[in-house]
């Protein structure tokens, strides 16, 4: 057990307790952030005259050699160390001697781990933003190619009105755009530097916290040392944002699974994103989409766990907070994997446009437009609604669509109908005349697509 502290104790830490407390098995992924933060801390200490320039250079060179050796596989992060902080410091002392013992001057593991977590989270938010943008670009590409691809829109999972594939994909664009904006907001709100807060009450050393913050790319130092070492709000916000991303992916997955079914046949998931049954050779299963849907609960669990962990913790730092890391790591890894997979699946998926259009015709999706036709000919809407309800009932009995009715059949139900009813209820007319902003009409969609392109240009 490699331990750098414990002079106050007269007994060795019980191995069971040591292993129970140790976090090296998971916080070793912080090694780059821990070294990055230590370099900035050392540069600040030298600037303030707390370290000599020679000591500064020795420590910086030693830290860089550790980083390089870990990256190249020459140095393994083993579980003989309690955490990543002790691993870095112990190896530094082994390499450069007494100068390495000065690394921790004016610093506590409390503000050190708070910094590491922020540096790591900041980097991962940037990566997540990139993956969300990839999704947005793929959605936009589908939208641009399908402004006139007619399909049924659904409410209550029943065919409702004709829309376009571009319009449907546009709904998901809006969702993931909000996700992207949420990630940007979290980054901005969390971008303050906790280093220099010490254990909870700052330090007696003359530290230049603003300089350290500047070196590390933060907007400035945190303003309360107790909050600095016990703040997990930004992680809760991130877990909430990741849960929302997964909720959107899960909804999308559910639709893809339904659309891919034999009953719908709206899409064909590429073989490279499908699996086959071990017993039924005819099966092509949408396992990728199903797993994305299934992993959503895992990310929800991370959010709930962190909230539950934090709810009863008094100020300032408590060991409970160590429990945040595995949850955050797993949630981030899960969401990154799901975003990348889903974007790839979407890029290779084929859309059955003819099937979508045919589904519209046989679902009475133009019934609302038939009612609007009557309203435009002077019939009160409530009466028009009842008349079209009778039309639908008639068609169901005859096993035909509204388009298949003769004019005589129309007139038997209402004399208001004329020959132009057929144009009024054609799927193309139903979609094309809906051109207010946000509607599925091609002209409306082109304006929205232009706005989306402008947004992505700024990403």
Q: Language-model segments: what does each one mean?
A:
Residues 1-202, 207-214, 220, 272-276, ...:
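A helix-coil-helix interface module used to build multimeric assemblies
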Residues 51, 75, 264-265, 380, ...:
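Conserved hydrophobic residue
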Residues 131, 157, 161-171, 175, ...:
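Short, contiguous, pocket-lining structural segments
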Residues 2-37, 98-99, 280-459:
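Glycine-rich cofactor/substrate-binding loops
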Residues 216-308:
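Acidic, glycine-rich loop-and-beta core segments that form the ion-binding/anion-interacting portion
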Residues 38, 66, 128, 132-135, ...:
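Amphipathic alpha-helices that form helix-helix packing interfaces
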Residues 145, 182-185, 189, 218-222, ...:
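Conserved helix-loop functional segments at active or binding sites
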Residues 43-51, 120, 164-167, 236-244, ...:
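Short, well-ordered beta-strand elements within core beta-sheets of diverse protein domains
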């Amino acid at each position: 057990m490699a331990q750098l502290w414990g002079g106050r104790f007269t007994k060795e830490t019980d191995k069971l307790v040591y292993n129970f407390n140790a976090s090296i098995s998971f916080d070793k992924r912080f090694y780059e952030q821990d070294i990055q933060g230590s370099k900035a801390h050392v540069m600040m200490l030298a600037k303030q005259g707390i370290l000599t320039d020679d000591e500064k250079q020795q420590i910086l060179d030693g830290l860089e050699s550790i980083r390089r050796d870990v990256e190249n596989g020459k140095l393994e992060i083993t579980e003989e160390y309690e955490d990543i902080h002790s691993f870095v410091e112990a190896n530094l002392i082994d390499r450069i001697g007494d100068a390495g013992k000065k690394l921790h001057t004016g610093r506590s593991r409390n503000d050190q781990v708070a910094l590491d977590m922020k540096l790591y989270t900041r980097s991962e938010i940037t990566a997540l933003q990139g993956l969300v943008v990839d999704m947005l670009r793929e959605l936009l590409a589908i939208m641009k190619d399908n402004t006139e691809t007619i399909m049924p829109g659904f409410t209550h999972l029943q065919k409702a009105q004709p829309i376009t594939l571009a319009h449907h994909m546009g709904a998901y664009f809006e969702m993931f755009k909000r996700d992207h904006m949420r990630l940007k907001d979290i980054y901005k709100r969390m971008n303050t530097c906790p280093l220099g807060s010490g254990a909870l009450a700052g330090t007696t050393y003359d530290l230049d916290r603003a300089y350290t913050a500047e070196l590390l790319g933060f907007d400035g130092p945190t303003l309360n040392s107790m909050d600095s070492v016990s703040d997990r709000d930004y992680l809760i916000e991130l877990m909430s944002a990741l849960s929302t991303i997964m909720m959107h992916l899960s909804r999308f997955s559910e639709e893809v699974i339904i659309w891919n079914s034999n009953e719908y046949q709206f899409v064909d998931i590429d073989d490279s994103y499908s699996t086959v049954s071990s017993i039924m050779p005819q099966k092509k299963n949408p396992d990728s989409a199903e797993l994305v849907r299934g992993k959503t609960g895992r990310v929800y669990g991370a959010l709930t766990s962190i909230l539950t962990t934090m709810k009863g913790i008094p100020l300032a730092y408590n060991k409970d907070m160590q429990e945040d890391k595995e949850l955050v790591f797993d949630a981030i890894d899960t969401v990154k994997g799901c975003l990348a997979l889903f974007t790839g699946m979407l890029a290779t998926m084929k859309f059955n446009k003819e099937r979508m259009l045919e589904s519209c015709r046989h679902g009475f999706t133009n019934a609302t437009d038939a009612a609007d036709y009557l309203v435009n000919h002077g019939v009160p809407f409530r009466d028009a609604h009842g008349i079209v309800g009778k039309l639908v009932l008639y068609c169901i009995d005859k096993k035909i669509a509204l388009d298949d009715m003769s004019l005589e059949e129309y007139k038997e139900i209402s004399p208001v109908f004329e020959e132009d009813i057929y144009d009024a209820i054609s799927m193309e007319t139903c979609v094309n005349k809906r051109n207010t902003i946000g509607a599925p009409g091609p002209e409306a969609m082109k304006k929205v697509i232009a706005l989306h392109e402008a947004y992505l240009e700024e990403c």
